[in-house]
Amino acid sequence: MQPPFRLFGAELSPYSVKVRSYLRYKGIAHEWIQRSAARQEEFSRYAKLPLIPVLVGADDQAMQDSTPIIEALEAAFPEPALQPQDSGLAFLSALLEDYADEWLNKAMFHYRWTYPADQESAARRIVAMMFDGGEPPAGLEDSVRSRMAGRLHH
């Protein structure tokens, strides 16, 4: 994969923001593309699964899943290094990344979808991003809210 890159993602996706932060840290040229109904056809050309982020290179090669994306980019763009040189610190860094990736999102989802005011706010923002300011179908916010809140296991 070669730059410039196109990154399909969403502001509310911790995995999308993780890859965008990495690209900014490295100074790697990229275009942020908000995944939305208007961009669905383009997104579908590259996505193997309906999940974000999707990173597309100038060669039209695409990757999904934030950790493998960053690992591939780190191999291609090693400076500045993401991981410390010291093996002990590198281990701790990898451990923290894995913990944050796999477990801290549970706290994020809890606070986004447990309390009614947060549910309403998150559903409203998700629907607004999906339709880029266009008119969404009636009841979509309620549908998103009930679907996502129903996924929590308390």
Could you say what each language-model-derived stretch is?
Residues 1-139:
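GST-like domain detector, emphasizing the conserved glutathione-binding G-site
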